[in-house]
Amino acid sequence: MHGRAYLLLQRDFYDLKENNYKGITARPVSEDMMEWEVEIEGLQNSVWQGLVFQLTIHFTSEYNYAPPVVKFVTIPFHPNVDPHTGQPCIDFLDNPKKWNTNYTLSSILLALQVMLSNPVLENPVNLEAARILTKDESLYRTILKLFNRPLQMKDDSQELPKDPHKCIGPTKTTSFSDYYQAWSRIATSKATEYYRTALLKDPNFIGQYYKWKKMDLQHHKEWNLKYSVIKCWLARKNRMPDEVRHSMEGIKLCPTQIPTTDEIFLESPTAINSVTNIYETEEEGWKSDTSLYENNTDEPWEEEVEDLISWINTLNTNTLED
């Protein structure tokens, strides 16, 4: 059998659905109706217009002889909301002596909506929020938009959930001062010295650059010679017959690697003289390069092809037709 508090909350819930207050949504999240989730939208023509706030309300079995405990899920930057506990500063909620048994769930939610949209600047619990709101309202609006989301209501129904246990979950309040400090550190962080140091201003890099440049000037001829040797080797390999190339690749189990200049010289000692001629003059180099390809490609199978072509030319077409 349900107690007195449960029956009173059922009555309050029915009354809330009947009145359908604009910008207020509430639903119980426990079977005994002691735990509630609430969403309140700021009133029109106020700095809170278009913003929504999530709260939790915890009733006890002593309701309505004692007020419930109200807390914001995300603590707003508001003069009348404690930045540490997330509890709103409303006299009949803070002081049980000022609580009246005539107060209902609807009266509590309406009082919260009025407090959010019309903050009291006398004796605020959040001094920083009161100071900014008094001196610069535009800055205050900007701060509010940092952590409040627009109101997005899927429907206006306020029915009991089919499975209340799915709605039950731990809620963690976040102080705005903690959130604001974390946001300030992230959004205004400065680059580390490593990324701020320009590359050309790094003495180590400049020294290494001149060292590389000096080595290149000293061994410029050697580098060009090695480049020409490798170029000739690759060109000669590409001109090999496909059958020979495939047979050679099938024997090798490891991927093909470009040989060093020493290996190329050992393979073909005459390449040294040819490559040297290529490097000395560009025009003579191309000629030597071409002659090198022709000399290297004079394989036996090419001679057979030439003999076959010569033999075909000697045939008498008239005799063949007969």
From Swiss-Prot:
Q: What class of enzyme is it?
A: transferase
What EC number(s) does its UniProt record assign?
2.3.2.23
Per the entry, what this protein does is: Catalyzes the covalent attachment of ubiquitin to other proteins.
**Post-translational modification (record):** Autoubiquitinated in vitro in the presence of UBR5.
GO terms for biological process, alphabetical: protein ubiquitination
This protein's name: Ubiquitin-conjugating enzyme E2 U
Task: Point out the gene that encodes the protein.
Answer: UBE2U
Pathway field: Protein modification; protein ubiquitination
